[in-house]
Protein backbone atom coordinates (compact mmCIF):
# COMPACT_ATOMS: atom_id res chain seq x y z
CA UNK A 1 0.00 0.00 0.00
CA UNK A 2 1.64 3.19 -1.14
CA UNK A 3 1.05 6.64 0.28
CA UNK A 4 2.51 9.65 1.99
CA UNK A 5 0.98 8.61 5.34
CA UNK A 6 1.24 12.13 6.71
CA UNK A 7 -0.17 11.02 9.04
CA UNK A 8 -1.35 7.46 8.56
CA UNK A 9 -4.95 7.25 9.80
CA UNK A 10 -7.57 4.63 10.59
CA UNK A 11 -9.01 4.87 7.09
CA UNK A 12 -5.72 3.57 5.67
CA UNK A 13 -5.77 0.66 8.09
CA UNK A 14 -9.39 -0.27 7.40
CA UNK A 15 -8.76 -0.05 3.65
CA UNK A 16 -5.72 -2.32 3.89
CA UNK A 17 -7.62 -4.84 5.98
CA UNK A 18 -10.59 -4.79 3.60
CA UNK A 19 -8.44 -5.29 0.49
CA UNK A 20 -6.47 -8.07 2.19
CA UNK A 21 -9.73 -9.87 2.91
CA UNK A 22 -11.31 -9.32 -0.51
CA UNK A 23 -8.23 -10.45 -2.44
CA UNK A 24 -7.05 -13.05 0.08
CA UNK A 25 -3.66 -11.39 0.50
CA UNK A 26 -1.06 -12.98 2.75
CA UNK A 27 0.48 -9.65 3.69
CA UNK A 28 -0.05 -5.93 3.21
CA UNK A 29 3.20 -3.98 2.94
CA UNK A 30 2.87 -0.25 3.68
CA UNK A 31 5.36 1.79 1.65
CA UNK A 32 5.71 5.42 2.79
CA UNK A 33 6.71 7.75 -0.03
CA UNK A 34 10.31 8.88 0.00
CA UNK A 35 10.67 12.03 -2.11
CA UNK A 36 7.57 12.66 -4.27
CA UNK A 37 7.65 14.25 -7.68
CA UNK A 38 4.14 15.59 -8.40
CA UNK A 39 2.21 18.66 -7.22
CA UNK A 40 4.78 20.26 -5.00
CA UNK A 41 2.14 22.30 -3.25
CA UNK A 42 2.74 21.71 0.45
CA UNK A 43 5.32 20.71 3.01
CA UNK A 44 5.41 17.10 4.10
CA UNK A 45 6.78 15.74 7.36
CA UNK A 46 10.23 14.17 7.30
CA UNK A 47 10.27 10.68 5.79
CA UNK A 48 11.57 9.18 9.03
CA UNK A 49 8.63 10.61 10.98
CA UNK A 50 6.15 9.25 8.47
CA UNK A 51 7.88 5.86 8.49
CA UNK A 52 7.82 5.63 12.29
CA UNK A 53 4.15 6.65 12.47
CA UNK A 54 3.36 3.89 9.98
CA UNK A 55 5.31 1.33 12.02
CA UNK A 56 3.45 2.38 15.17
CA UNK A 57 0.07 2.23 13.45
CA UNK A 58 0.56 -1.23 11.93
CA UNK A 59 2.45 -2.98 14.74
CA UNK A 60 -0.55 -4.79 16.23
CA UNK A 61 -1.63 -6.49 12.99
CA UNK A 62 0.53 -9.51 12.06
CA UNK A 63 -0.68 -9.22 8.48
CA UNK A 64 0.81 -5.74 8.10
CA UNK A 65 4.44 -4.74 7.59
CA UNK A 66 6.25 -1.55 6.58
CA UNK A 67 8.91 -1.20 3.88
CA UNK A 68 11.60 1.47 3.59
CA UNK A 69 12.31 0.85 -0.11
CA UNK A 70 11.12 4.29 -1.24
CA UNK A 71 12.73 6.14 1.66
CA UNK A 72 16.09 4.39 1.40
CA UNK A 73 16.32 4.54 -2.39
CA UNK A 74 16.81 8.29 -2.47
CA UNK A 75 15.73 10.67 -5.20
CA UNK A 76 12.16 11.15 -6.44
CA UNK A 77 9.71 8.33 -5.69
CA UNK A 78 8.16 6.71 -8.74
CA UNK A 79 5.71 3.83 -8.47
CA UNK A 80 7.57 1.88 -11.15
CA UNK A 81 10.64 1.83 -8.91
CA UNK A 82 8.57 0.83 -5.89
CA UNK A 83 7.08 -2.12 -7.76
CA UNK A 84 10.43 -3.16 -9.19
CA UNK A 85 12.05 -3.20 -5.76
CA UNK A 86 9.17 -5.08 -4.14
CA UNK A 87 9.14 -7.62 -6.94
CA UNK A 88 12.89 -8.17 -6.54
CA UNK A 89 12.35 -8.80 -2.83
CA UNK A 90 9.35 -11.09 -3.40
CA UNK A 91 10.08 -12.92 -6.63
CA UNK A 92 7.35 -15.55 -6.20
CA UNK A 93 4.60 -13.22 -4.98
CA UNK A 94 1.62 -11.83 -6.89
CA UNK A 95 1.75 -8.10 -6.19
CA UNK A 96 -1.27 -5.86 -5.68
CA UNK A 97 -0.58 -2.13 -5.48
CA UNK A 98 -3.11 -0.41 -3.22
CA UNK A 99 -3.52 3.35 -3.46
CA UNK A 100 -6.20 6.01 -3.28
CA UNK A 101 -8.63 5.85 -6.18
CA UNK A 102 -8.39 9.62 -6.60
CA UNK A 103 -4.65 9.22 -7.22
CA UNK A 104 -5.44 6.95 -10.14
CA UNK A 105 -7.08 9.92 -11.84
CA UNK A 106 -3.61 11.06 -12.87
CA UNK A 107 -2.21 7.62 -13.63
CA UNK A 108 -1.51 8.41 -17.28
CA UNK A 109 1.04 10.99 -16.11
CA UNK A 110 2.94 8.46 -14.02
CA UNK A 111 6.36 7.51 -15.33
CA UNK A 112 6.17 4.33 -17.47
CA UNK A 113 2.60 3.73 -16.35
CA UNK A 114 1.94 1.05 -18.98
CA UNK A 115 4.79 -1.11 -17.67
CA UNK A 116 3.51 -1.00 -14.11
CA UNK A 117 0.52 -3.17 -14.93
CA UNK A 118 2.85 -5.98 -15.93
CA UNK A 119 4.37 -5.88 -12.43
CA UNK A 120 1.24 -5.69 -10.28
CA UNK A 121 -2.52 -5.49 -10.20
CA UNK A 122 -3.82 -2.14 -9.01
CA UNK A 123 -6.48 -1.63 -6.35
CA UNK A 124 -7.91 1.86 -5.88
CA UNK A 125 -9.62 2.42 -2.53
CA UNK A 126 -12.27 5.12 -2.38
CA UNK A 127 -15.12 6.61 -0.48
CA UNK A 128 -18.55 5.15 -1.34
CA UNK A 129 -19.95 6.55 -4.58
CA UNK A 130 -16.60 7.48 -6.11
CA UNK A 131 -16.28 6.95 -9.86
CA UNK A 132 -13.07 7.04 -11.87
CA UNK A 133 -13.56 10.03 -14.17
CA UNK A 134 -11.91 10.94 -17.42
CA UNK A 135 -12.66 9.41 -20.80
CA UNK A 136 -8.96 9.24 -21.66
CA UNK A 137 -8.30 7.20 -18.52
CA UNK A 138 -11.22 4.86 -19.07
CA UNK A 139 -10.21 4.34 -22.69
CA UNK A 140 -6.67 3.46 -21.62
CA UNK A 141 -7.95 1.03 -18.99
CA UNK A 142 -9.95 -0.87 -21.62
CA UNK A 143 -6.67 -1.92 -23.23
CA UNK A 144 -5.66 -3.72 -20.03
CA UNK A 145 -6.81 -7.12 -18.70
CA UNK A 146 -10.13 -6.97 -16.81
CA UNK A 147 -8.48 -7.65 -13.45
CA UNK A 148 -5.67 -5.11 -13.92
CA UNK A 149 -7.51 -2.44 -11.92
CA UNK A 150 -10.16 -2.79 -9.22
CA UNK A 151 -11.98 -0.15 -7.19
CA UNK A 152 -12.93 -0.92 -3.59
CA UNK A 153 -15.26 1.29 -1.56
CA UNK A 154 -14.20 1.84 2.05
CA UNK A 155 -16.55 3.98 4.21
CA UNK A 156 -13.74 4.78 6.67
CA UNK A 157 -11.95 6.74 3.93
CA UNK A 158 -14.13 9.68 4.86
CA UNK A 159 -11.14 10.29 7.16
CA UNK A 160 -8.35 12.17 5.39
CA UNK A 161 -4.74 12.94 6.24
CA UNK A 162 -5.27 16.58 5.26
CA UNK A 163 -8.09 16.93 7.79
CA UNK A 164 -5.97 15.27 10.49
CA UNK A 165 -3.14 17.71 9.77
CA UNK A 166 -5.50 20.68 9.89
CA UNK A 167 -7.02 19.55 13.18
CA UNK A 168 -3.57 19.06 14.72
CA UNK A 169 -2.46 22.50 13.53
CA UNK A 170 -5.57 24.02 15.10
CA UNK A 171 -4.90 22.04 18.31
CA UNK A 172 -8.11 20.08 17.86
CA UNK A 173 -8.23 16.36 18.80
CA UNK A 174 -7.28 13.65 16.32
CA UNK A 175 -8.11 10.81 18.71
CA UNK A 176 -9.98 7.94 16.99
CA UNK A 177 -9.08 9.34 13.57
CA UNK A 178 -5.55 7.98 13.82
CA UNK A 179 -4.21 5.15 16.02
CA UNK A 180 -3.50 6.10 19.64
CA UNK A 181 0.26 5.68 19.24
CA UNK A 182 0.25 8.05 16.27
CA UNK A 183 -1.66 10.67 18.28
CA UNK A 184 1.08 10.52 20.90
CA UNK A 185 3.88 10.58 18.30
CA UNK A 186 2.40 13.66 16.60
CA UNK A 187 2.17 15.45 19.95
CA UNK A 188 5.68 14.47 21.05
CA UNK A 189 7.27 15.57 17.77
CA UNK A 190 5.13 18.66 17.41
CA UNK A 191 4.15 17.64 13.88
CA UNK A 192 1.73 19.80 11.88
CA UNK A 193 2.35 22.80 14.10
CA UNK A 194 3.91 25.99 12.81
CA UNK A 195 6.98 25.36 14.98
CA UNK A 196 7.92 21.66 15.15
CA UNK A 197 9.50 20.49 18.41
CA UNK A 198 12.49 19.07 16.56
CA UNK A 199 14.27 21.11 13.92
CA UNK A 200 15.52 17.98 12.15
CA UNK A 201 12.00 17.09 11.07
CA UNK A 202 11.59 20.53 9.55
CA UNK A 203 14.91 20.26 7.74
CA UNK A 204 13.75 16.95 6.32
CA UNK A 205 10.52 18.40 4.98
CA UNK A 206 9.78 17.89 1.32
CA UNK A 207 6.76 18.81 -0.70
CA UNK A 208 4.30 16.08 -1.58
CA UNK A 209 0.75 14.95 -2.24
CA UNK A 210 -1.29 12.30 -0.50
CA UNK A 211 -0.53 9.26 -2.63
CA UNK A 212 2.50 7.69 -4.21
CA UNK A 213 2.95 8.07 -7.96
Curated annotation (Swiss-Prot):
The UniProt entry, under CDD domains, shows: NMNAT
State any single GO MF term: ATP binding
Enumerate the residue ranges of region (Disordered): 194-213
Basic and acidic residues bias: where?
A: 200-213
Q: Does the keyword Zinc apply?
A: no
List, alphabetically, the InterPro entries matched: Cyt_trans-like (IPR004821), NadD/NMNAT (IPR005248), Rossmann-like_a/b/a_fold (IPR014729)
GO BP annotations, alphabetical order = NAD biosynthetic process
Give the main EC class.
transferase
Q: Which UniProt keywords apply?
A: ATP-binding, NAD, Nucleotide-binding, Nucleotidyltransferase, Pyridine nucleotide biosynthesis, Transferase
Catalytic activity field = nicotinate beta-D-ribonucleotide + ATP + H(+) = deamido-NAD(+) + diphosphate
Q: Which family is annotated?
A: Belongs to the NadD family.
Function summary = Catalyzes the reversible adenylation of nicotinate mononucleotide (NaMN) to nicotinic acid adenine dinucleotide (NaAD).
Q: What is this protein called?
A: Probable nicotinate-nucleotide adenylyltransferase
State the organism named in the record. Answer: Mycolicibacterium smegmatis (strain ATCC 700084 / mc(2)155)
Gene symbol? Answer: nadD
